[in-house]
Design a protein with these regions (language model features):
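Hydrophobic alpha-helical segments and helix pairs
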Residues: 102-103
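Short alpha-helix boundary/capping and kink motifs at helix termini
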Residues: 2-86, 90-97
Length: 103
């Protein structure tokens, strides 16, 4: 990768924060208040499968992060967060904040 490309990428992704969080039901509920209005509808099948995995201790940390854009809006993770709320079970997630907004 050339220095020019590295510099361009550094500028684009400057300020992105990432962490491993053990998200409690209370934290998940708070994060869901940051959901954007036009997000896709909740898939009951997807939600029920996530809840089943959590209840049976089969839910594992994955590379799919809970993501927030630069405005603090939740852009990825609503099903997983809702499953945490509904099961009452704390779960580990990769959380990324300050992602550039899609234009």
């Amino acid at each position: 990768m050339t220095n020019q490309v590295q510099n361009a990428l550094s500028t684009i992704y400057e300020g992105i924060e990432y962490s491993l969080e053990f998200i409690t039901p209370e934290q998940a509920q708070f994060y869901l208040t940051k959901n954007f209005d036009n997000n896709r509808k909740i898939s009951r099948n997807n939600l029920e499968e996530l809840k089943k995995e959590m209840r049976n201790s089969r839910f594992i940390l994955s590379d799919s992060a809970i993501c927030f854009d630069t405005d603090g809006t939740l852009v990825n993770g609503q099903h997983r967060l809702l499953a945490v709320v509904q099961t009452g079970m704390t779960q580990p997630f990769l959380v990324v904040k300050n992602m550039p907004s899609k234009s």
